[in-house]
Regions:
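Glycan-recognition and processing domains
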Residues: 3-59, 65-79, 98-100, 117-130
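Extracellular carbohydrate recognition and processing domains
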Residues: 83-109
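Short, aromatic- and glycine-rich surface loops/edge beta-strands on solvent-exposed regions
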Residues: 110-116
Length: 130
């Protein structure tokens, strides 16, 4: 049992060590989104979600860089259990956005969800979870 726990811990630590990795390429999306080079354009009506991470309990910082010129609030939600449990959210503005998030327990299938109902495009450049 100790070996399994150590193995899991090592897996978690390797995930945490890669925290500066841009997660945009791991995101899922509906038909109202498209790739523009290495950026995901979420058009009006578009939904971006994922990347379904498994993370140990600790403090994290979610950083999202977008290009967005709209005036309507664009909200990115942090959820688990297929969106049934909302752990946090942030209003996105043009440029760099960040929130701190504390996970009290091991969290599986952690996802970041952006449903665009702003009438404008939101270009997602970078997502990190460190």
């Amino acid at each position: 049992a100790t070996e399994v726990k150590q193995s899991r811990l090592l897996t978690y630590l390797s995930d945490v060590a890669r925290g500066d990795e841009n997660l945009v390429k791991q995101m899922k999306y509906n038909g109202a989104c498209e790739w523009m080079e290495d950026r995901l354009v979420v058009h009006n009506g578009g939904v971006m979600y994922g990347p379904y991470l498994t993370m140990p309990p600790m403090q994290y910082k979610l950083c999202v860089e977008v290009s967005y010129e709209g005036s309507e609030a664009a909200v990115l939600a942090v959820t688990k259990e297929s969106g049934k449990v909302r752990l946090g959210e942030m209003q996105l503005k043009d440029g760099f956005n960040a929130i701190s998030l504390y996970l009290e327990e091991k969290t599986e299938n952690l996802e970041f969800v952006l449903s665009n109902a702003t009438g404008e495009d939101i270009v997602v450049k970078k997502i990190t979870f460190i």
